[in-house]
Amino acid sequence: MERKDRLMEIPVKKIGEFVKGERVEGFFLLKSVTLKTTNSGGKKYLDLVLSDKTGDILGKVWEIKPEHEELKSNTVFKIRGTVNSWQGTLQLKVEHASKVTEEDNINLDDFVQSAPYTSDEMFKTIKDTVHNMNDIDIKNILNRVLEINKDKLMYYPAAKSNHHSIKGGLLYHITTMLKLAENICGIYDFLNRDLVYAGVILHDMAKIKEMSSNEMGIVDEYTLEGTLLGHITQGIKEIEVIGKEVNADSKIIMLLQHMVLSHHYEPEYGSPVKPLIPEAEMLHYLDVMDARMYDMKKAIKETKENEFSERIWSLDSRRIYNHGMYEKNK
């Protein structure tokens, strides 16, 4: 009876429903568990990233107890705590954590955020785009890149924690950008469609080598090569190797490398050169547009109507306003 009464007092909620100041309880996937030390006093605490279908939230375990030693990443736990805010972002102060049992009837897939389309559908969209290209060298390079990376591409996210950091997120990012590119190329019809589409497909492909992800689309860490070189350098290396393997024209190889090399636009963001061809310029803005719209849509979904979101780091720490006038069922 005591257990039942307590559950009636503490709401069971999804992360997207959390409100500052309330106590909550529920089942959450632990995406990461990190032991840290406070700057003052040297006290140990745990940083958690909790996740469900509706989003992620940072969890804090300030008082480490024996029960917390069982907390492991990529597992589901029953968590109880209080929702608070730090620097404009919601956090969960974890008070209790327990392992799930068979009686809880937990399905791991119910906690994994994933793209709104199947990976097979999205991969087919990319393959169809390549099939309809005119330049044989670009087609050969892309088909080989897709062949090499297909298995991991089916579940890899586009980032560890920023835009499209979900299962199948990299495919989703690419296919959305391809839709944008198709419309843009219809307006600016002097652009070489094959180059634009190829840039879209290739620009983040090396994130598969930059990050280490499990099949749930959760990135545990960056690879050694990814940390030392980054996906832009890794990407242009792969284009060079595959381009020579398929005997592609050296100019085509160079143009594709330039597309990847310049798509972050600024040196401080990883691009040593700015776009020097219009297709590369367009690629940059397609990338930025899709990333920002993804993050804004996510913020709106997590924010009540006529209220502002928490501060979104990837959007220059802006708070996004939900005016409630968006297209429904989208």
Language-model region placement:
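Short, acidic/hydrophobic/Gly-rich beta-strand patch recurrent on exposed beta strands
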Residues: 47-52, 213
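Divalent metal-coordination and catalytic microenvironments
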Residues: 28, 74, 177, 287
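OB-fold nucleic-acid-binding modules
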Residues: 2-24
